[in-house]
Amino acid sequence: MSGIQPVPGAKPLSMWQQYGPSEKTVRGIVIGGITGGIEICITFPTEYVKTQLQLDERSATPKFRGPIDCVKQTVNGHGFFGLYRGLSVLLYGSIPKSSFRFGTFEYLKSQAADERGNLSPVMRLLCGLGAGLSEAVFAVTPMETVKVKFIHDQGLAQPKYKGFVHGVGCIVKAEGLGGIYKGVTATMAKQGSNQAIRFFVMETLKDWYRGGDNTQPISKPIVGLMGAVAGAASVYGNTPIDVVKTRMQGLEAKKYKNTLDCAMQIWKKEGFFAFYKGTVPRLSRVCLDVGITFMIYDSIIEFLDVYWKKQQ
């Protein structure tokens, strides 16, 4: 329930106004979805390289010598757009993921903010955590599982997936619906910690920059810089979780009993630094990703605020 109460003598509130989500929550859902679609089209190549490196397990003859070599081999073998293989799968997931993330955060923030619209440090962390868990369960886990399997499949000599629908059908047929929820525990841990760190850092930097005055504007380059800092903090905070999640969602996930077993096998067979495999491409991707995401999100909100005020 939105908590909106009718004013005596005023026009009766509709069912949507009384029981539906608040305006900020709806804006978070819609604008978040638009933001997610734009952002993933810009940053996908680094996501592709990161995933390829994490799936390239240590062996006597590793396929890639690093991120640059991965890019070279991909472009030489498939052309420039080879770096965009699997984009459609991630695009299908990025829009709902971003919608759940920002919609949930805006809802939780509206419930936890003080009279000036600011969050306490603990609430920043908890609202970010809630946003991450929401996107993990409802969007990230199924779509990331499909994405990782697609990218892994495209690296094989004879790919078996002919397209998004065919690929999902093959996965469900072979593994059941549970096949697209492989690694859900690791994904919840990853997304929860990711967004807890990012929103905490972002809201803290914004509050510091504004001096506690929530009405003060922040230029878009500064928002982008804050987003990059928040992204970098999340990378160093949870890359090990990301590595385990990727292994659990790959085509060879069946060799692991569960998330803990996957982590133990990586530790025993590959050592501590295997948990930070793919950090360089992930760092560049995430800093760019988070910076762009918050810039786009804030820009669309400002644009719509001006438009809506003109309509009133």
UniProtKB/Swiss-Prot annotation:
Q: Give the chief site where it resides.
A: mitochondrion
Pfam families recorded for this chain? Mito_carr
Q: Kindly state a single biological-process term from the GO annotations of this entry.
A: mitochondrial citrate transmembrane transport
Q: Oxidoreductase as a keyword?
A: no
Q: Name one GO molecular function term.
A: citrate secondary active transmembrane transporter activity
Q: SUPFAM superfamilies under this entry?
A: Mitochondrial carrier
Q: Does the keyword Transmembrane helix apply?
A: yes
Q: Which InterPro entries match?
A: Mitochondrial_sb/sol_carrier, Mt_carrier_dom_sf, TXTP-like
The protein's role, per its UniProt record: Transport of citrate across inner mitochondrial membrane.
What protein name applies here?
Answer: Putative tricarboxylate transport protein, mitochondrial
